[in-house]
Amino acid sequence: MAECIQCGAFTKFDKGLCLDCYNKKNKSVAPIVKEEKMGLSDKDKTYRYNMIKGRIAETLIQELFLSLGYNVFRYGMENTIPGIIELLKGVRSDVALEIRRMPDFVMQNPTTKDVHFVEVKFRASGEFSSKDLPKDYPYGNAYIVVVSKKHIKCITVKELGEGKEITTTSHNYLGNRKEFDLDKDVIIDFCKFAIQFFENV
């Protein structure tokens, strides 16, 4: 172990001075290094928390459609290009914007074989309108599935463009969409899951 040549205390360097002896000799005080804060910043915590809520909502919808025999393909940016989320943080470009806007899923109806883009959103308020959609959203034929603490509702990008919206009192439930022809009892089961997961959010 290296010792100070003056006082014998621990030092980093063999045949060197410890910090106290060095400061006395040079009549200066080494700057106090501010201890770095450990853990996530508040901004990073919020980002990660919202990401987790979104992923839970996506998983609920994925499992709901899978349980009804749908072919479900994860399509969003984090699935098509793994690791891209971190790379695009703070990047402002047309390409980055297009990648961020990719819908979460491509789903195929087992009966009709129709294919749909599906974007999943969690909203504690249970509300969604055109102002919640990115400007110039390129997937005009996509369905927006909104998972809230109480309901699972659905609206198309086209309907949002016509001024329609999802509110706490609207009746645009996922089970009412004729395009999907879903079992309402299964949807109710998944609504109960949503209540369990998002009850305290």
Where are these regions (language model features)?
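Catalytic phosphate/metal-binding cores of nucleic-acid and nucleotide-processing enzymes, i.e., regions
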Residues: 49-57, 64, 91, 100-103, ...
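Short cysteine-rich clusters marking metal-coordination/redox-active sites
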Residues: 4-7, 18-21
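Catalytic cores of nucleic-acid endonucleases
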Residues: 68, 112-172
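Non-catalytic C-terminal interaction segments of nucleic acid-processing enzymes
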Residues: 31-32, 112, 153-201
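Acidic-basic catalytic patches of nuclease active cores, encompassing PD-(D/E)XK
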Residues: 34-93
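Cys/His-rich microdomains that often coordinate metals
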Residues: 8-12, 25
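Short Cys/His-rich micro-motifs in 6-15 aa windows
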Residues: 20-30
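Active-site beta-strand-loop-beta-strand hairpin of nuclease catalytic cores
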Residues: 98-117
